Amino acid sequence: LDVGIVPRFIDDVFRRKAQIEKERPGCEIVIHVSFLEIYGESVRDLLDMDQSINKEIIIRSDPSGNVLISGQKMPQVATAEELQEILDNGSLYRTTGETSMNAFSSRSHAIFTVYIDQEFPSPDACDDSSSSDLRQSKFHFVDLAGSERLTRTHAEGRLQHEGIDINKGLLVLGKVIRALGDEKLKGR
């Protein structure tokens, strides 16, 4: 069975978690997850099962330049199966539309984030057993809405406008990525 990068990542994270906790007694590894959808101008929490209430997700930066997101659910997960189930269930809430090319065409971008906190007993703490080192990691998996040729999708009305907006957004994103990789623009 050929699985994608996210299921392989999930299996690898929990395999490594078990290995580290076995090799480093006292190490604690905690894993949380979030799943956001960007549709048009709005951000939606795909892990919030009560979709009838429009909860506001607030995205801002702190003075250090870190992106902070408030209002989203971030459940803790204990197993690879639990994490995969959360991803699968959240994916069911993605905004889709039917075109002649795809019955479930994604109309949004999605960001699936896995947060890993590793706490190791500090080797410098001779007598203080409460001292520890904390290592935090974040892995973002981004699924972009695909570009569409209107002549092939035969989209009309709302779906046509969404397709045009998706294509414009992907064009701008492509320009940003090229600019980030352009050596002549480094430092600007």
Walk through the language-model features, giving the residues of each.
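P-loop NTPase motor catalytic core
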Residues: 1-188
